[in-house]
Amino acid sequence: MPLLILAATGPALATGLGAVPVFFMGRRAAAWQPALWGLAAGVMAVASIVGLLQPALDQGSLVAVAGGLAAGTAFLVVTRVALSSTHPHVGQLRGADVRTSILVFGVLFVHSLPEGFAIGTVYASETAGLGLFVILAIALQNIPEGTSVAIPMADAGFSRRQQFWAAVATSAPQPVGAAVAFALVETVSGLLAV
């Protein structure tokens, strides 16, 4: 289990790595924002379609997949509406960039738990080499997520350190999800062996 937690922490650190390019842009981050958002969205969209949507359609019904997509979309719309009617601030920072920072952070934080489930399930299955492949795939996909976190934070005036650790924190659920999934698979496997 300690090796699993360590392995699941790697993709979280990769999310922090995604914040690093934004550090070097300084005031130019705003000019690069459309390109960075586009890059991050493109990578995440392809990862979602190839890594999530296609396997879901292969394993389940179109109705179930459409229901999941609708629920996720509704969650984002409700969250965005709730944030737009408030005036969030962090310290002296206020405005739309703070709102966007909170929304992006929250969505990616929630999104990280199933990634942890994937890591824990693969490690519990003891499939040679697959665990490392899943960790590397999630880590690569997490890099643009870190960029997505850092972009609005840079515009809102957050420090580089805050951008980096906020990006890493969005993936904090991954080790927790990995441990929970690993324990569940081990428990169920033990029950099936009886």
Where are these regions (language model features)?
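Intrinsically disordered, metal-sensing/regulatory segments
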Residues: 1-194
